[in-house]
Swiss-Prot record:
This is Adenylosuccinate synthetase. The active site is at residues 13, 41. Homodimer. It is an enzyme of class 6 (ligase). GO terms for cellular component: cytoplasm. It comes from Zymomonas mobilis subsp. mobilis (strain ATCC 31821 / ZM4 / CP4). GO terms for biological process: 'de novo' AMP biosynthetic process; IMP metabolic process.
Length: 429
């Protein structure tokens, strides 16, 4: 059995939660390997909706779940999210959930700095969730971070706390903000430590043991390839590497553990927040896509921008993320359109591109070159086999495969877990 790594193939919000939940039923371990609580997952199981942003999707099904060292953790959000799920009768214990001891913490000073920067940015906002993800990663790279393991030694890390606070006080001074209250921060950390430490474990060792037992491991990515800090629409990106290769470093496993890479993509395209979006539709069609697809961010509640499927971006995502197969979601949202468009290139000035150039002004100026195909009137909602799909919907799927140079492995036709068409089992490689 192969391991499976799930990544978003667009700008996030592709429906990874449902697909991961569907796969988690057959996995032995589910691992988050990057990001923080800025990425929302919505699961619908037996008519019950679960919303997660930090915890791996496997917790809902009771699958062993691990938050890897590549994830930045807000301990207070962890507590609140866990309590909310427990109220929905989800069982979460140290036997079913582990947090890497080396995961960096998101502290209140990180989310505050995030907000200070966004407020100062004016009309040039990146569109951050203001949850401190970026500043926490900055401190990790700057070797200032307080990590999960440090919560067991708060009284012994005074010099490190002083260095961290001095750095942030210098930044806060530039924004005209008061210094960090050191005493309060220490007390807050001592208070929350008891919630986190029971789950703190050597995640790399657990995973190594599971691998030796030939367990099926499912790596759950957050955000999407086009939000990757290196390969995305910079600077309108997240603060971590979202591509499949990060599963190795962000979990403590070797590169060979990544296995089958399943990219999740909507049958159209959406984006939350600022940044280039060549196929964005500021018209009735875009509004219809948003209404039918219930396009609001799980974490922020912000309305998502909507547009036609972009095969250029997808082909680029497939290449840089090493995607083996695609899970196509929300096909049912396209039911009833007379015609559907697919972006096959970009025009920037007098030049046509078959990829998205890296310069941000070129990205903003890119105009889509469309191919138009006939739509379908029949409903695809709830379909669980190819025979239930309209012929024109199948034609649309096949055309996407040709354009992105990657096979469609799964098709999702509703938020319900079982409304999924399996073309190829990712766990079989």
């Amino acid at each position: 059995m192969a391991n499976v790594t799930v990544v978003g193939a667009q700008w996030g919000d592709e429906g990874k939660g449902k697909i991961v939940d569907w796969l988690a039923e057959r996995a032995d371990v589910v691992v988050r390997f990057q990001g923080g609580h800025n990425a929302g997952h919505t699961l619908v199981v037996n008519g019950v909706t679960y919303k997660l942003s930090l915890l791996p999707s496997g917790v809902v099904s009771g699958t062993l779940s691990i938050i890897g060292n590549g994830v930045v953790i807000d301990p207070w959000h962890f507590r609140d999210e866990m309590e909310r799920l427990r109220k929905q009768d989800v069982v979460i214990t140290p036997d079913t959930l582990a947090i890497a001891e080396t995961s960096p913490l998101i502290l209140p000073l990180h989310s505050e700095l995030d907000g200070f920067r966004e407020d100062r940015s004016g009309d040039k906002k990146i569109g951050t969730t203001r949850r401190g993800i970026g500043p926490a990663y900055e401190d990790k790279v700057g070797r200032r971070a307080i990590r999960v393991c440090d919560l067991a030694h708060i009284d012994e890390i005074g010099s490190r706390l002083d260095r961290l606070i001095a750095h942030h006080n210098a930044l806060r001074s530039g924004f005209g903000k008061p210094p960090v209250d050191r005493e309060k921060l220490v007390n807050d950390l001592k208070e929350i430590a008891g919630c986190i430490l029971p789950f703190a474990k050597p995640a790399w060792r657990i995973l190594a043991d599971e691998q030796k037992k030939n367990r099926r491991i499912l790596f759950e990515g957050a955000q999407g390839v086009m939000l990757d800090i290196d390969h995305g629409t910079y600077p309108y990106v997240t603060s971590s590497n979202t591509i499949a290769g990060s599963a190795a470093g962000g979990s403590g496993m070797g590169a060979s553990a990544v296995g089958f890479v399943l990219g999740i993509a909507k049958a159209y395209t959406t984006r939350v927040g600022a940044g280039p979006f060549p196929t964005e539709l500021d018209d009735e069609v875009g509004q219809t896509l948003g209404e039918r697809g219930h396009e609001f961010g799980t974490v922020t509640g912000r309305r998502r921008r909507c547009g036609w499927f972009d095969s250029v971006l997808m082909r680029q995502s497939v290449a840089v993320a090493g995607i083996t197969g695609i899970a196509l979601t929300k096909l049912d949202v396209l039911d009833g359109f007379d015609e559907i468009k697919i972006c096959t290139g970009y025009k920037i000035g007098d030049k046509v591109y078959d990829y998205l150039p890296p310069y941000y002004k070129d990205q903003a100026a890119a105009k889509p070159v469309y191919e138009t195909i006939e739509g379908w009137k029949e409903s695809t909602a709830g379909a669980r086999s190819w025979s239930e799909l309209p012929a024109q919907a199948i034609k649309y799927i096949r055309r996407i495969e040709e354009l992105i140079e990657c096979p469609i492995t799964l098709v999702s036709t509703s938020p319900e877990r079982e409304d999924t068409i399996l073309v190829k089992d990712p766990f079989l490689g």
